[in-house]
Amino acid sequence: MAVLKMPRFKKYHLRLMITCFSTLLLMTYWEKIDNCVVTHVMSFSYRYLFNSFKFINSSFIVNPEDAIKYNHRYLINHQTKCDNKDILLLLFVKSSSENFERRQAIRSTWGNETYIESTLGVTVKVLFALGLHPIPEERGKLKEDLMFEDQKYRDLIQQDFIDTFHNLTLKLLLQLGWKETYCHHAQFLMSADDDVFVHTPNLILYLQGFGQSNTRDLWIGGVHRGSPPNRDKESKYYVSRDLYPWLSYPDYTPGSGYVLSRDVVSRIYQASLTINASFHIDDVFLGICAKMMDVSPTDHAFFSGEGKAPHHHCIYSLMMTSHGHVSDIHEMWRHARNAEDVLISSGLFRRLYCTAVKVRLLCVPFFSNSYPCKAAFFEEDT
């Protein structure tokens, strides 16, 4: 009998060891599991079941006296940049003082105002939004370089806040305030990072499709819905529960690239004057301001927030933005201007071919792509 009971005892012992090991493993990695899985489930539930963000009106309001501290002095400004112009798009590029080569690359490629006006037939104004270098010694060295650069190109807008990740909301306020004050008549505002490639031919064609000057309620980009606050203290995106105790952010578009119509800029700017700008994640801050004004973003499959677009003419023909481009920006611009890479000819075979290519490039399981899988089925007139 004892011989018969031994295997049963070993099986029980094995189950106990597996249970203990699993429990220990769960306890060890619970914070990561919580951040990656549980918080997303909770935030999505909050977003889609409750969808209540009434707290914004009470918790984020600041009085005018406190709001003044977020107004910063212009060190470099061009008040007449938009004078006497019928401007389709004001395009602000968020840059850092030391990123001269990135600005040069943009000026000679997708941000070339002369090319856009002569070839695409519209007026677009491109400006670079800057703060102060965080290191005082470097700040002094860069001051003269920036003055020389601006004398040549006349496209820098700088305020006297320290240019760090945790002050990106101040850079957003710079863009909104400058648009409202000096370029109110521009039909659209775009904000982009200086490592983003903007396919200006596609973007201009897309914006022209909305008509002349009466477009309203437009906020377009790659929309994040039901995103949870990051509670990992080691992350630069960390937000404490004291600062933001709720389970989900309002809908927002990544700061790497999005477009707002003139009326939306005005409404969000007015909201920003009454909301606590110490919230340092600029794209979420934009979403909070927009929610307060009852403005919702529209998702566009080819606005990239996460990474580089795959190289293929079936992608270039629909691309709006692609993130993470510095060394290859000239190659991207060559493709953007190449009619073979830009135009999808009519015909069922070509459409089927490009759909198959996009499925292969964008719908890879367990792989983070620049565009979502649904972009594979995106059409030009969508």
Swiss-Prot record:
Under Enzyme Commission nomenclature, its number is 2.4.1.206
Where are the bilayer-spanning segments?
14-30
Q: What GO biological process terms are annotated to this protein in UniProt?
A: protein O-linked glycosylation
Output the superkingdom of the source species: Eukaryota
Enzyme class, UniProt record, top EC level: transferase
Q: Which reaction does it catalyse?
A: a beta-D-Gal-(1->4)-beta-D-Glc-(1<->1)-Cer(d18:1(4E)) + UDP-N-acetyl-alpha-D-glucosamine = a beta-D-GlcNAc-(1->3)-beta-D-Gal-(1->4)-beta-D-Glc-(1<->1)-Cer(d18:1(4E)) + UDP + H(+); a neolactoside nLc4Cer(d18:1(4E)) + UDP-N-acetyl-alpha-D-glucosamine = a neolactoside IV(3)-beta-GlcNAc-nLc4Cer(d18:1(4E)) + UDP + H(+)
Coiled coil stretches, renumbered: none
**A Gene Ontology cellular-component term:** Golgi membrane
Segments on the Lumenal side according to the record's topology features? 31-382
Q: Which residues lie on this side of the membrane: Cytoplasmic?
A: 1-13
Detail the disulphide connectivity of this chain as listed in its UniProt entry: none
One example GO MF annotation: glycosyltransferase activity
Copy the pathway line from the protein's UniProt record.
Protein modification; protein glycosylation
Q: Which residues are glycosylated?
A: 57, 112, 167, 276
Keywords of this entry: Glycoprotein, Glycosyltransferase, Golgi apparatus, Membrane, Signal-anchor, Transferase, Transmembrane, Transmembrane helix
Which compartments is it annotated to reside in? Answer: Golgi apparatus membrane
UniProt topology in membrane = Single-pass type II membrane protein
PANTHER family associated with the record? BETA-1,3-N-ACETYLGLUCOSAMINYLTRANSFERASE, LACTOSYLCERAMIDE 1,3-N-ACETYL-BETA-D-GLUCOSAMINYLTRANSFERASE
Q: Which family does it belong to?
A: Belongs to the glycosyltransferase 31 family.
Chain's role: Beta-1,3-N-acetylglucosaminyltransferase that plays a key role in the synthesis of lacto- or neolacto-series carbohydrate chains on glycolipids.
Q: What is this protein called?
A: Lactosylceramide 1,3-N-acetyl-beta-D-glucosaminyltransferase B
Species of origin reads: Danio rerio
